[in-house]
């Protein structure tokens, strides 16, 4: 409650703060709270928002299925919650659609951010034959391990290409900024209402970073068409 105690009128919180957000919201009814990826809206001043991350992971799966040589995709997963499991399923189904021999191997690290654990997980997956590394965690450690090992990888949440320029095929980008601007303006002008938002490629909340030229133009065209289809 340090932020609201300092007079902030609109507070945005990320994963891991669902129950604390609702607890504090009860004590500060005049403050608007926005919680990412949660589902509890116990008070009228609490809204939730999330992105259709599975749409982006569908694109990654298509790319991975085409780029792998070992047919093993390594996936570093944070927590076994619907958001993460949905992404694993979407990626695997998309990969198997273009390459039926695909197998997905998963390491659960039970954290959103821990470079040490993420590095160990990436290396363990590579040691098990994965030549494509994916992550639903937030550090750059996995892509850096992949770069060193000479395998493909995908960035998470932002463009991580500079950390692994040869390894990264692209990155999923979580672009919350238009939503934050829209909701902050609503809070300021008095039109803010409780809601649950779930946007994706169509709205731009999920986006893709530039593609690695190693993919080749034909694969890039396939992915761009698939992205259009998912956004329609």
Residue ranges and their predicted role:
Residues 15-23, 118-156, 166, 177-178:
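Hydrophobic alpha-helical
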Residues 49-71, 172-191:
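Hydrophobic alpha-helical segments within soluble ligand-binding/sensing domains
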Residues 169-232:
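Structured C-terminal subdomain patch of bacterial secreted/periplasmic proteins
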Residues 38, 51-58, 78-88, 106-116, ...:
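Hinge/beta->alpha junction and helix N-cap segments in small-molecule ligand-binding domains
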Residues 1-8, 12:
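Single conserved hydrophobic/aromatic residue that forms the stacking wall/gate
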Residues 5-6, 110-126:
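Structural motif
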Residues 57-102, 106, 196-216:
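An alpha-beta-alpha
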Residues 26-51, 158-167:
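Flexible loop/hinge segments that line or gate small-molecule binding clefts
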């Amino acid at each position: 409650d340090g932020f609201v105690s300092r007079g902030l009128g609109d507070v945005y919180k990320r994963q891991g703060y669902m129950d604390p957000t609702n607890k504090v919201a009860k004590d500060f009814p005049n403050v608007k709270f926005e919680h990412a990826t949660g589902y509890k809206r116990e008070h009228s001043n609490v809204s939730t928002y999330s992105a259709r991350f599975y749409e982006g992971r569908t694109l990654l799966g298509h790319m991975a299925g085409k780029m792998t040589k070992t047919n093993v995709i390594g996936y570093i997963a944070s927590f076994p919650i619907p958001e993460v499991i949905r992404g694993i399923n979407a990626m695997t189904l998309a990969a198997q659609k273009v390459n039926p021999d695909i197998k997905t191997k998963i390491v659960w690290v039970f954290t959103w951010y821990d470079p040490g654990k993420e590095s160990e997980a990436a290396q363990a997956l590579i040691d098990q034959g994965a030549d494509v590394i994916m992550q639903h965690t937030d550090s750059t450690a996995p892509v850096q391990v992949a770069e060193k090992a000479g395998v493909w990888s995908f960035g998470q949440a932002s463009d991580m290409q500079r950390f692994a320029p040869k390894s990264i095929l692209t990155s999923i980008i979580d672009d919350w900024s238009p939503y934050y601007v829209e909701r902050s303006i609503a809070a300021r002008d008095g039109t803010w209402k409780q809601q649950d938002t779930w946007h994706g490629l169509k709205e731009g909340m999920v986006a893709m970073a530039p593609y690695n030229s190693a993919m080749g133009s034909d694969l890039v065209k396939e992915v761009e068409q698939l992205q259009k289809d998912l956004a329609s």
